[in-house]
A protein has these predicted regions:
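Aromatic- and carboxylate-enriched substrate-binding clefts and catalytic-loop regions
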Residues: 1-137, 142, 170
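Short, well-ordered loop/turn elements at secondary-structure boundaries
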Residues: 14-16, 68, 146, 152-153, ...
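Short conserved micro-motifs at the rims of enzyme active sites and ligand-binding pockets
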Residues: 84-86, 134-136, 161-164, 222-224
Length: 227
């Protein structure tokens, strides 16, 4: 199996890809999402019962790293402490959304805050992207706050933008955000993390800043299709 994995990764490399992302390996290997795992991930053993689950996972990550050569590797749905040193970046949270702001707030802001200690320690910690769609989905004012924090977090910045939503203001704001993030000299630390699951107060380069994760009414249920 490891040779098969290497063959596939080498193929991507030979095609010219220099940014390779692997995803869903933890659920493929263990049969469960991390949040659903108890003491045992699965009742089924691996074919080689002389190695532990951790060793199986580590060998898998090492195979990808070897085959990717000098390409940048992004992990996703991984075991962070085992991936450390074997990928330049790692998606550390679930998907954010261009449709549902509450999902971005829960999966993006929360992830950035509580997985920040891994950034530049295990790898660059990717809290997922800013999803920008035309008016009627997530308000630009809220997405702009998320973009402002990500750009200055010292963590990677990714954006998924519908061209129809790329107004002159959006383009100018994105250009400035990428200019800031490309330097990667900023340091950000959540301050109210003990009593806020989506920290709004951050220390950025030694200065305290406040971010607004709610609309003017506090919380707008219309932005959360799941509720």
């Amino acid at each position: 199996m490891l040779e098969h994995v290497k063959t596939q990764i080498r193929r991507f490399y030979d095609w010219g890809f220099r940014l390779i992302k692997h995803d869903f390996s933890s659920i493929d290997l263990c049969g469960l999402w991390g949040k659903d795992m108890k003491f045992f991930a699965t009742g089924l053993p691996f074919a080689d019962q002389t190695v532990t689950t951790a060793e199986v996972v580590l060998h898998f990550y090492e195979a990808i790293r070897e085959a990717a050569q000098d390409a940048v590797v992004i992990g996703c749905n991984t075991f962070p402490h085992l991936l450390a040193g074997l990928a330049e970046l790692n998606r550390t949270g679930d998907d954010t959304s261009g449709y549902d702001w509450n999902r971005t707030r829960r999966m993006g802001v929360n992830t950035l805050a509580f997985r920040m200690p891994q950034n530049r320690t295990f790898y660059m910690s990717d809290a997922d992207c800013v999803g920008i769609r035309p008016a009627g989905d997530v308000p630009w004012a809220l997405n702009k706050e998320w973009l402002r924090l990500l750009a200055r977090s010292g963590a990677p910045l990714f954006v998924s933008c519908d061209p129809k939503a790329a107004t002159p203001e959006v383009r100018a704001t994105l250009t400035e955000a990428f200019r800031i993030n490309a330097v990667q000299t900023d340091e950000a630390e959540p301050l109210d993390w003990l009593d806020n699951t989506c920290p709004a107060d951050w220390k950025i380069n030694g200065q305290t800043e406040h971010f607004h994760w709610y609309d003017e009414l506090g919380y707008n249920a219309a932005l959360d299709p799941e509720k």
